Amino acid sequence: MSDGETPAVPSLYEVLQLAKDYPTAGEEHNLLTLALAMPMGGLIIFDGPSSSGKTHSVNSASSTFTNHENLVYTVPTTASETALYYEFDKMNQRPVHNWGDLASMEKTWEPILKDHGDGRPSNRKVTDVTLGEVVDKTIDPPATLILQIATDNEDINLNDYAEIKNRALILTSDGSREQTEAVMALQAAVEARTFEPSVGEERAAQIREYMTGVFETAEIFRTRRESEKPMATFWNPAAEAIAEAEVIPPMFNEARRDNQRLFKFMRAVALYHHAERLMTFLEDGERVMIVTPVDCWYAMVIFGEKMLRSALNLRGHDIEVLSLLREKPSSYTVAEIQQMLIQGGHNVTDRDVRRSLENMFTKGYVIRHDDSPITWQASPMASYMDYKSKIDWEDVVEKAAETVRANLPAEQ
């Protein structure tokens, strides 16, 4: 590339390959979601079994940005609340805060996260050992908060923190046997020095430069306080057509927030394509970036299935458990279900199975027989998991174009 030449806009496939060069096995949807969501800002919950690579995936996604070593502040799981305020300078310099396993932090995280969740700085008086006096320390809210939760830890349950859960994009790490085999094979390749990156050094530098530009562009859409107004917003003229297609199933109230999450991720994809997207002014003077049907399509491919399952109140191991019960129309104990899942290649504990069944029982997906021992089977409502949206992308494009023509001057 000659001096002054603008680097080619990388495809999302290239971004994914660069993230996997960290190196990382599998986790394609999570890596792309993290890389696209980090510049957009907000709250991300990343749950999954212990030792399933959540921190590694965060580091892998952040490696797609320039100077990524200084992008993410990983909160030590052993840090006390007071100790974090002594780190305020370092925390305030890094736009992404990655909170490790919350269950191991006792209540360290609650005061800070409650402040940051409301868009407020978190303040505390601490003793400055160099001055020998009490001073105020402030941790500013970061652009993006990532909260990790180990689903096999009995000390924490995401459902107990509804306010945090309702504001977040929620990802789940892959704890399957197949993923473990892929990770071990990659580890062996690295140890044997046979692993080779997919992206060359020059192209990797170009991709990181572009991705860092996404972060910089995001500043005009971001606010640090609830009282602030951003310099620009997004306009998604395809939103109504997508809503009409019932991409998000409306069976449960959760669909309301999942619909908003999906639209936010569509904005994140548009932000990624900022170099190719129109920034314009509406009649009321508002500056907007237009979210295109292409952005919506990418968002559906990367994130749509997660939103569909979330709207159906199916998360974690629910799909595996419910699919098994539908295939075997009888009733089974927790231990029997666990053994069948393990034989099918899923790494699950009896606690995973029990929590999944209890969650689905409250939503009507399974029937509990109070025998001795208790047994479970799929209910007629389990057929909801076959839900398919009625989206017609040609119709989405046509309606989006009509909306744009009706709201923008002809010269634009």
Predicted features along the sequence, with ranges:
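Long, charge-rich low-complexity segments
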Residues: 61-85, 89, 308-337
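Short, hydrophobic-biased segments on the C-terminal half of alpha helices
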Residues: 62, 263, 354-358
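Structural motif
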Residues: 21-31, 251-260
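Phosphate-sensing "switch" segment of ASCE/P-loop ATPases
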Residues: 139-144, 152, 158-320, 324, ...
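Conserved ASCE/P-loop NTPase catalytic core
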Residues: 22-205
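Charged, amphipathic alpha-helical linker segments immediately N-terminal to NTP-binding catalytic cores
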Residues: 1-28
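Terminal-proximal interaction/regulatory segments of ATP-powered molecular machines
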Residues: 312-412
